[in-house]
Amino acid sequence: MARAVGIDLGTTNSVVSVLEGGEPTVIANAEGARTTPSVVAFTKDGEVLVGETAKRQNVTNVDRTISSVKRHMGTDWTVGIDDKKYTSQELSARILGKLKRDAEQYLGDSVTDAVITVPAYFNDAERQATKEAGEIAGLNVLRIINEPTAAALAYGLDRGKEDELILVFDLGGGTFDVSLLEVGKDDDFSTIQVRSTAGDNRLGGDDWDQRIVDHLVKRFKESTGVDVSNDKIAKQRLKEAAEQAKKELSSSTSTSIQLPYLSLTENGPANLDETLTRAKFEELTNDLLERTRKPFEDVIREAGVSVGDVAHVVLVGGSTRMPAVVDLVKKLTGGKEPNKGVNPDEVVAVGAALQAGVLKGERKDVLLIDVTPLSLGIETKGGIMTKLIERNTAIPTKRSETFTTADDNQPSVAIQVFQGEREFTRDNKNLGTFELTGIAPAPRGIPQVEVTFDIDANGIVHVSAKDKGTGKEQSMTITGGSSLGKEDIERMVREAEEHAAEDKTRREQAEVRNNAEQLAYSIDKLIKENDDKLPEDVKSEVQGDVDGLKSALAGDDEDAVKTAFDKLSASQTKLGEAIYAQGQQEQAAGETPEGASEAKKDDEDIVDAEVVDEDDEDKKTDR
């Protein structure tokens, strides 16, 4: 039976998890690690590498190695490799495809369904692009859920029997979210409802790394006079060193960064040898840390609670291991110690697997209620953003509002859909436009156009407009900035499946050949063993088909092998019929008078017995 998995598609690393016996298990990849780098590399000989093997290409193959793709989801960003442009969806699909294969190898079963997580603050275009990436990878995306929600799902189910507020502080490689969730507990059922969420999709661990890189570039120029800011290979080496330094500074107060032969000068190779203290690192990145403060405060304010009402604080994402982040969270929550019982790299995937289990009926003890992170509305006269659905509204949801025309005899209205919190549409994200035509001529203000927003459980928006006078209706599903039509997705799915299809064809051809060789051998043997029992015409016909199949097997024409195989499969039944008929004739010939005499002689030794009641004094036995 095909299995469903939960996938955390991260900026830096990705994780896949599955329910086994109702409990989540993180699946190790083919390399034995529980996290897979979200990196794709194209080698010069045409091979596509994903994960750790791709990450190792970062320095030697810098122009053909792509990382942090998640930051480009929902945009028209592309990268060119060998005269072919790849979208963020296609590259993300490569990562998802590896996770899918690794899960299938671990489970020994096919994986078709998945719940994929996204940052809570992802807009509609970014969510749609994530769903498309899953489809390209050959996955049926059961649900797109928010990362903090998934983390709370994984964390909250095992915590006591009381109703509690859980605050999730999620700082990943490329995105940042804060969510406040309420976990309601009954005896055997839990309801997890998102109360509010806020974040910054352009803030993550990559930005902390970049500050170290900028610092090292500056120090290297000061000490050697060489500016490596435009040297791609040097910058990549610095980036890897910066990431490692950041990790080391989480447990040490200083770290040494040594990069020999980083560049060349007139006097020979120039080496980098720097010591970075935690204090200096925190000074370099203090403004980044401060950017996490406002979303935290917004979430508390919009939920209408005080910090003291929060029962648990959960840190999610590898970047929350930085001591400065932990200290800030403690300060913001009034000294509350963040929970240390969850793995920040894995908890989101675990929650996604639990949600997959809920959707597939494997877990029936939890209900998840998420929210839309940004307000949705349309543009009305003057470029005003008229909101139909406010941010932090529970989803799925549906809202309608009636609008009218701005001019006399206006024959149509353009419905421009926006997402965001600003008062004017020009400052918000344009999700798309469609036109409702055929409005009956009438003075301005008379026609009534009902606009309906419908947000599904994935957070994806559907919009419709209906003229109440004529009954005419127009609708659209927002695809935002992903720029992928149905044909594009189908083409990418075909390309992603191309190699798998080739392998499948080769395997099927090999199976046909194996079956054909086995059939030819077994029929050949059957004919030889029953040579005297087979009529010449049957034997000649079937032997001819055997020889024909052997001849086809000697060649490379797979269609000829299949045709010859089918022909012999049909004609071989005549052998069975002939052998069975011969056996019946021999049996009939064997019923001779001598045989009857022998039967009579044998019968003399048979006792005929009549069974009667034991109490019957007249019981008798005839011999």
From Swiss-Prot:
One example GO MF annotation: ATP-dependent protein folding chaperone
Residue ranges, compositional bias (Acidic residues): 604-617
Phosphothreonine: modified positions: 175
Keyword vocabulary terms for this entry: ATP-binding, Chaperone, Nucleotide-binding, Phosphoprotein, Stress response
InterPro entries: ATPase_NBD, Chaperone_DnaK, Heat_shock_70_CS, HSP70_C_sf, HSP70_peptide-bd_sf, Hsp_70_fam
Region (Disordered): 580-623
Domain of life the protein comes from: Bacteria
Chaperone as UniProt keyword: yes
Pfam families hit by this protein: HSP70 (PF00012)
Induction: By stress conditions e.g. heat shock.
UniProt key word Phosphoprotein: yes
UniProt cross-references to SUPFAM superfamilies, sorted A to Z: Actin-like ATPase domain (SSF53067), Heat shock protein 70kD (HSP70), C-terminal subdomain (SSF100934), Heat shock protein 70kD (HSP70), peptide-binding domain (SSF100920)
Job description of the protein: Acts as a chaperone.
Protein family according to the UniProt entry: Belongs to the heat shock protein 70 family.
Name the UniProt record assigns to this protein: Chaperone protein DnaK
The species this protein was found in: Clavibacter michiganensis subsp. michiganensis (strain NCPPB 382)
Gene behind this protein: dnaK
